[in-house]
């Protein structure tokens, strides 16, 4: 019985707080707060602004290298596994792929902002 009463009180209190949080901000709407914020850009202008392809390529390269670094993060805990040589070979291959990708991007001037 106490459990049912506690669940009922918790559910009703949660429902009251959620409804207050939903309805209270709608009482006084500020025009500046109601407008969208687009990272400092005017949201009323054209949405088809030219996009820098260099920025896109550098961003994709960053995401790929960041993913490979995320794969390397658990390696210190992998030292505790019995097959230490397999872990070392895997980490060496992963670091080699990372270094080769960085060299390829550097040689093809994929990391340059100016052309």
Swiss-Prot record:
Q: Which GO terms describe its biological process?
A: mitochondrial electron transport, NADH to ubiquinone
Q: Which GO terms describe its molecular function?
A: NADH dehydrogenase (ubiquinone) activity
- GO CC, alphabetical: mitochondrial inner membrane; NADH dehydrogenase complex
**Where is the protein found, in the record's own terms?**
Mitochondrion inner membrane
**Known EC number:** 7.1.1.2
Q: How does it sit in the membrane?
A: Multi-pass membrane protein
**Keyword set for this entry?**
Electron transport, Membrane, Mitochondrion, Mitochondrion inner membrane, NAD, Respiratory chain, Translocase, Transmembrane, Transmembrane helix, Transport, Ubiquinone
**Family classification:** Belongs to the complex I subunit 3 family.
| Subunit description | Core subunit of respiratory chain NADH dehydrogenase (Complex I) which is composed of 45 different subunits. Interacts with TMEM186. Interacts with TMEM242.
Q: This protein is called what?
A: NADH-ubiquinone oxidoreductase chain 3
Organism in which the protein naturally occurs: Sigmodon ochrognathus
Recorded name of the encoding gene: MT-ND3
């Amino acid at each position: 019985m106490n459990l049912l009463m506690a669940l009922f009180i918790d559910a009703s209190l949660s429902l009251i707080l959620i409804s207050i949080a939903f309805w209270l901000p709608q009482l006084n709407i500020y025009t500046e707060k109601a407008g969208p914020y687009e990272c400092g850009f005017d949201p009323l202008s054209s949405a088809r602004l030219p996009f820098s392809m260099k920025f896109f390529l550098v961003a994709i390269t960053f995401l790929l290298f960041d993913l490979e670094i995320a794969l390397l993060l658990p390696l210190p805990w992998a030292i505790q596994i019995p097959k230490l040589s397999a872990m070392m070979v895997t980490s060496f291959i992963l670091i080699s792929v990372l270094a080769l990708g960085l060299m390829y991007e550097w040689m093809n001037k994929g990391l340059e902002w100016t052309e």
